[in-house]
Regions:
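Glycine-rich nucleotide/cofactor/substrate-binding loop typically near the N-terminus or early
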Residues: 1-52, 109, 118-122, 128-138, ...
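Divalent metal-coordination and catalytic microenvironments
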Residues: 6, 66, 141, 212
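Generic secondary-structure signature for well-ordered alpha-helical cores
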Residues: 11, 25, 29, 42-53, ...
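Conserved phosphate/anionic-ligand binding catalytic regions in large, soluble enzymes, centered on
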Residues: 59-82
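Active-site glycine- and acidic-residue-rich loops that bind
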Residues: 68, 131-135, 199-203
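Mobile "lid/hinge" segments at catalytic clefts and subdomain interfaces of large enzymes
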Residues: 83-183
């Protein structure tokens, strides 16, 4: 698959958050891009602090030049495309063990797991062994996108592929993105709230159902059942 790959003269220097942000602020990019990139690195810093239990942290892989390019490049793409929403399908985390600067850990890395605890993204193990989602990737997606279980109905206008550096003979190591037009497509999502009660009067139930309809419920009903100790509910 033909894909775009960005090469950097990567530096593996360990950097503090302040040193990384100083590099970010020197980038030739609009203020909105710089601000978003700063938020992403702050997300990573908070995750690292939570994992290691200290405010004195140094970025290792995340502070390298290629990771900084990943973050600024992603923010610039969002700025130029200016999409209405950015949606992310369930992310494959990978399986097995991984080795980083702090030792060997089960996949996903501790910082990645902490970043996913924001609740904005859906995750799954996936079919491939090894680390499939890095802390940098998790931070970018947590900042710019929201997770969805499946692709919504819409018209695919463009498709883009970004290539990674790992060579997997079984699967192309690319990230795919769709630019879609979903306006005018109907997507009706209904939440259902159910509860069992056996200690309220019929008058109370009737009043509750009426109030629910007044507050915007599509429908409301009460179904009589026989509950414990033979009590009607």
């Amino acid at each position: 698959i033909a894909a775009i790959k960005v090469h950097t003269h990567a530096s593996s220097a360990h950097r503090t958050l302040g040193e990384v942000l100083a590099i970010v602020h020197k980038a030739d990019a609009p203020p909105a891009v710089i601000a978003q990139a700063e938020r992403i690195f702050n997300r990573i810093a908070k995750a690292e602090e939570a994992v290691h239990g200290t405010h004195h942290i140094h970025f290792h892989e995340v502070g390298a030049d290629d990771a900084i390019a990943d973050v600024i490049g992603s923010c610039m793409a969002v700025h130029l495309l200016s999409p209405g929403r950015i949606l992310s399908l369930p992310i494959a985390l990978g399986t097995g063990m991984m080795t980083c600067a702090h030792g060997t850990y089960p996949v996903p890395a501790p910082a990645t797991a902490e970043l996913l605890s924001s609740g904005r993204l859906l995750a799954m193990s996936g079919e491939h062994a090894g680390e499939q989602l890095t802390p940098t990737g998790a931070a970018i997606l947590s900042e710019i996108s929201e997770g969805i279980p499946s692709l919504p109905a819409g018209y695919i206008q463009k498709t883009g592929y970004g290539a990674g550096s790992r060579d997997d003979p079984k699967s192309p190591n690319v990230l795919r993105a769709f630019l879609m037009e979903c306006s005018g497509m109907s997507e009706d999502i209904v939440d259902i709230l159910e509860t069992n009660v056996d200690d309220v009067t019929g008058e109370c139930i009737g009043t509750t159902l009426g109030r629910m309809m007044e507050e915007g419920a599509r429908d409301a009903c009460a179904i009589p059942v026989l509950m414990k100790k033979g009590r009607p509910g």
